[in-house]
């Protein structure tokens, strides 16, 4: 039984301090939340960045400052910067973090409804993102909000338009307008990826804990964090990303699973070890 990889999505692009005052905006706040998640058991940090006033940005320099500050404190953590950004951003804006040559980055696998907005990921956009990641030696985390997104990216991999096996998928379930977060849907998604692939689930909102437990039982991995959910339980806001990660650790240990550290996560994900 492989160890469980926990990813912490520490701020996202949508959630605000008005919803939970612990949501990080500044560089110092991002480092604080990164450390809380790492110390609780997260091997991976999924990174969005904000301006100090909370405005989402895909600016290369802002990503560099934030990621450098985190790396100084957590030298072995895996960071996966977002290329999803926020709805309405151009593909050129969204690609900026790949200029930093991270180990991994997200690649969203199709257009979908996103609440009242459209998350636009056309085939030309996806090809451009795949080309950049191939050129820069970046392993994508393929974010799939709908079942068709899996088929789309598998077809692209066969054509060499995106990096192929071993592939890492993140199933984002529970976004309003996309695939509901049910155990049946999660199992179906997981059954559609190639042998040798790895996968993680992001359960959005109240679905976070059901999806976490189901993924652990199925042999998958788990993403939690303020981007996806700000509550530990009904009416109980988390005081940090670390509290959310710690809850996943408790669930995993009750189910007999050990937690992967960053070195073990790199091996599971077929990443190069740190030098």
Predicted regions and their residues:
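Conserved, mostly hydrophobic/aromatic
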Residues: 30, 37, 48, 105, ...
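Catalytic alpha/beta core domains of metabolic enzymes, predominantly
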Residues: 104-227, 238-239, 243
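N-terminal small/glycine-rich loop or linker at the start of catalytic domains
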Residues: 1-22, 106-113
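Short beta-strand segments at enzyme active-site cores
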Residues: 42-52, 79-83, 143, 265
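Mid-to-C-terminal alpha-helical segments outside catalytic/metal-binding sites
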Residues: 246, 250-275
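Glycine-rich, proline-tolerant flexible connector loops at the mouths of alpha/beta enzymes
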Residues: 18, 43-66, 114, 171-173, ...
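Alpha-helix-loop-beta-strand connector modules within alpha/beta enzyme cores
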Residues: 2, 8, 55-81, 128-135, ...
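Active-site beta->alpha loop and helix N-cap motifs at the rims of alpha/beta catalytic domains
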Residues: 27, 57-121
């Amino acid at each position: 039984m492989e160890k469980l990889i926990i990813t912490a999505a520490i701020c996202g692009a949508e959630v605000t301090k008005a919803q939970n005052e612990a949501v990080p905006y500044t560089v110092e706040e991002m480092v604080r939340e990164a450390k809380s998640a790492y110390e609780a058991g997260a091997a991976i940090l999924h990174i969005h960045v904000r301006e100090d006033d909370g405005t989402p940005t895909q600016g290369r320099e802002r990503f560099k400052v934030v990621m450098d500050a985190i790396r100084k404190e957590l030298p072995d953590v895996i960071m996966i910067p977002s290329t999803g950004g926020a709805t309405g951003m151009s593909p050129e804006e969204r690609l900026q973090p790949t200029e930093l040559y991270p180990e991994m980055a997200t690649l969203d696998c199709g257009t979908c409804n996103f609440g009242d907005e459209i998350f636009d990921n056309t085939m030309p956009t996806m090809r451009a993102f795949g080309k950049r990641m191939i050129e820069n030696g970046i392993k994508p985390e393929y974010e799939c909000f709908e079942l068709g997104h899996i088929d789309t990216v598998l077809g692209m991999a066969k054509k060499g338009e995106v990096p192929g096996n071993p592939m890492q998928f993140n199933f984002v379930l529970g976004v309003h307008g996309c695939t509901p977060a049910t155990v049946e849907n999660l199992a179906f998604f997981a059954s559609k990826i190639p042998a040798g692939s790895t996968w993680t689930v992001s359960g959005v909102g109240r679905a976070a804990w059901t999806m976490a437990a189901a993924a652990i039982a199925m042999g998958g991995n788990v993403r939690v964090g303020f981007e996806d959910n700000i509550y530990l339980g009904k009416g109980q806001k988390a005081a940090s990303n670390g509290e959310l990660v710690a809850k996943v650790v408790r669930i995993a240990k009750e189910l007999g699973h050990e937690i992967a550290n960053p070195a073990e996560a790199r091996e599971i994900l077929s990443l190069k070890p740190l030098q």
